[in-house]
Amino acid sequence: MSKVLEQVEAIVTPITDELQLELVDIAFEKEGPNWFLRIFIDKDGGVDIDECAAVSEKVSEKMDENDPITQNYFLEVSSPGAERPLKKEQDFENAVSKYVHVTSYEPIDGRKMWEGTLVSYDGTTLVITITDKTRKITCEIPKDKVAKARLAIQF
């Protein structure tokens, strides 16, 4: 995480903690000529628009006092959605028995992408059951080889 995002996280975390919300992720991205600071929040049962607005107002006030971002940007606060990213240890633990999408930095047994049920996670290894054509395969993926992971919607 960049130094700027770490500073933003230090500003946002007390706000989400106060409102009993989980800070899922922070992204600072350029789209066309515009920059966006995106803050993703959640809680059991999901967040509503009023909670997103409350976080947005409080973060905006704090960022006006001491903003680590020098250029102009748009602030967006939202839910991570149904395909929320898995980043923290707790995210992976909570995703056990759920359908996930995982990519790796390098091929593991000839694959760099898996989509299936996360059977277990022990802190170092993800065990995923995938369907390859008509057969089920169990794959072990070392956590340190995971480039990205998220919940996925199964069709």
Swiss-Prot record:
CDD domains (alphabetical): YlxS_C (cd01734)
Keywords, ordered alphabetically: Cytoplasm, Ribosome biogenesis
Gene: rimP
A biological process from GO: ribosomal small subunit assembly
Cell compartments where the protein resides: Cytoplasm
Protein known as: Ribosome maturation factor RimP
Record function comment: Required for maturation of 30S ribosomal subunits.
HAMAP family membership: RimP
GO cellular component: cytosol
InterPro entries: Ribosome_maturation_RimP, RimP_C, RimP_C_sf, RimP_N, RimP_N_sf
SUPFAM superfamilies: YhbC-like, C-terminal domain, YhbC-like, N-terminal domain
Record-stated family: Belongs to the RimP family.
UniProt source species: Listeria monocytogenes serotype 4b (strain CLIP80459)
Main location: cytoplasm
